[in-house]
């Protein structure tokens, strides 16, 4: 069987064997409902508490109760935006939300929905580097602004947004601040207190944990109307039977992610740079976005004259997994939205390929990818009508 190379880690990651190992007893033996009063339920409580401890420490939250378990970051993002709509827009008349054009569809689409309910949403444009400035946020805030929602790191370019500066502005202005940290956790340090964040969304499967489990940090003292009703789970904030094995797995994945931050920077970052430098030797290849202020595992490459989907399938035939952008929208085959937002032509925006590494990738895999990608570029350009 040919070697398979996985370079789509911004879409999802393989589960760490240590995570799988710690989850296994709760799938086989300790399967009781944590809300039950008998021993099958109560024996799960220490493991849940330990997992929550790992989670809140991993993002430097103030208290273990500040982290609420959800099914994924999409739920967390929806909860924040819709909860703020109920708490701030309807009850207090603060009918304005600020976000960016570069957000994940889980934020953008929810904002579109809120617009249909009468909420005014400002979508801040990104500059030619793929980022925004804190001053843009400051200038957009009005007396009616209820929430600012800006991702910590972009899922396509890997660009890191100025979260600490934005957090300071929001604190000064008395505006709630939410960040989608899905692409930041496990790649760079995330500190909710230092960043003055009120809400932070994350998802375990993006840092080598299981799919179907995520979390929402809610700063102590900040209220948020529940999205789900029907139980008193998570101190009455999020109804639904606790998914014990996945909570345990997510906690361990967070612990391992924090422990590997230096490895991400020193080893994964160097592998990404090696891949990038080799591909830039191909004529008419460019890296999209700022190459300095970004997470260490991600590169968004544009190969002029080659449709991103064509390159994607050519790589796939060689057992190399990559992406043309967000996996949540990859079946749409639309032009890369970040490239469109920075002003690239629609034709050029269709040429984007995202390569995202993890701590499980090897140098041999990168060497093989360079070889296959370079050969594919020549072959596809020979049959391209636009090059």
Curated annotation (Swiss-Prot):
Pfam families: Aminotran_5 (PF00266). One of its GO terms (cellular component) is L-cysteine desulfurase complex. Its cofactor is pyridoxal 5'-phosphate. [2Fe-2S] cluster binds at residue 328. It is found in: Cytoplasm. Gene3D superfamilies: Aspartate Aminotransferase, domain 1, Type I PLP-dependent aspartate aminotransferase-like (Major domain). Pathway: Cofactor biosynthesis; iron-sulfur cluster biosynthesis. Belongs to the class-V pyridoxal-phosphate-dependent aminotransferase family. NifS/IscS subfamily. This is Cysteine desulfurase IscS.
